[in-house]
A protein has these predicted regions:
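Active-site flanking residues adjacent to catalytic metal/cofactor-binding acidic residues
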Residues: 51
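Short, Lys/Arg-enriched N-terminal segments with co-localized hydrophobic residues
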Residues: 1-14
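Rhodanese-like catalytic fold shared by cysteine-dependent sulfurtransferases
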Residues: 12-48, 56-97, 106-146
Length: 146
């Protein structure tokens, strides 16, 4: 077992492969992060649009924030790109300020960085994700399977 661990360590070092933990850390150093309190305050004032990037099965199991737009992580860049054949103008509308969330804020950190790299300067990550937003007082609704 220790030999396997050593092999994996050597492989990652030789290949210069970054861990997901490193990627999230780097993303968090370059993106805007909003506390659940900040998100709730901005949301209550109508200043932000929440985008839930979790997998649909997570929404079926745990629900989502009321009025959040669901865009699966794998489609985010495509649905928000007006030049993409997948662009979702009707679903997206005229969004001014975007706050992304996932379960814990890790996937949404990477997604926030990706949108920032696309040129969105009005995007932030909800610190702590869905779990923290629930605790901050957001209304959770259940998503029905289609």
């Amino acid at each position: 077992f220790m030999l396997l661990i050593s092999f994996i360590d050597i492989y990652f070092n030789i290949m210069n492969i970054k861990s997901s933990k490193e990627l999230v850390k780097e993303a968090n150093e370059t993106i805007k992060i909003m506390s659940p309190k900040q998100v709730k305050s901005s949301y209550d004032k109508g200043e932000v649009t929440l985008i839930d990037i979790r997998d649909i099965r997570e929404l079926w199991k745990e629900g989502t924030i009321e009025n959040a737009i669901h865009i699966p992580r794998g489609m985010l860049e495509f649905w928000l790109d007006p030049q993409s054949s997948y662009y979702q103008e009707k679903k997206i509308g005229n969004i001014k300020n975007i706050v992304l969330f996932c379960a814990l804020g890790l996937r949404s950190a990477l997604a926030t960085k990706a949108l920032k790299e696309m040129g969105f300067d009005n995007v932030a990550n909800a610190e702590g994700g869905f779990d923290s937003l629930k605790k901050a007082g957001f209304k959770v609704i259940h998503k029905e399977k289609k």
